Amino acid sequence: MSLHRSSQKSRAAEVDVIVNALNPAYTDWEVDLPWMTAAVTDAAKATGATVLIPGNVYNYGQNLPPRLSAATPHIGDHKKARQRIEMEAAYRSNGVKTIILRGGDFIDTAPGDNWFEGQMTAKVAKGKVAYPGPTNLKHTWAFLPNMARAAEMLAARRGTLPEFADIGFPGYALTGDE
């Protein structure tokens, strides 16, 4: 779907669910997230479509508790967390039916632009592996094919969900040592 607001509205008239999986570069979030959110909410309001967003765990802050749930507070103790919290608040306050399927860092069987391949294993041929933190601490991961199936099931059941549904995707929690 085009990033232009008028184009999104006309194209969205043909759909029941808008999947907003656009992810600009982190350095562009401050500028891009607000207008992208406005464009998607405008299109959803104009057509009655539900918005489905693959969410992340940034909202919970830097010091995650051992177990996350919908009741885990959104801390906003770093810039990316605050930006995601603001984006999600815009969906909640704009009267748009929204489903956030919240998961850890993405992993997949196919090459792509994700943290696992772009950072962790980018230099594995040289015998180097990077890890997002101490290797003895758990890190959350979402296997994309499984998360996509969960998103599809949620979209099919959107009529039974609340106006703003924040749903955790269980995924995997592994240490670097594991």
Q: What is the predicted function of each stretch?
A:
Residues 44, 91, 123-124:
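A generic structural signal for well-ordered alpha-helical segments
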Residues 104-139:
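NAD(P)-dependent short-chain dehydrogenase/reductase
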Residues 1-47:
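NAD(P)H-binding glycine-rich loop region in Rossmannoid oxidoreductase-like domains
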Residues 142-147:
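A conserved structural motif in NAD(P)-dependent oxidoreductases
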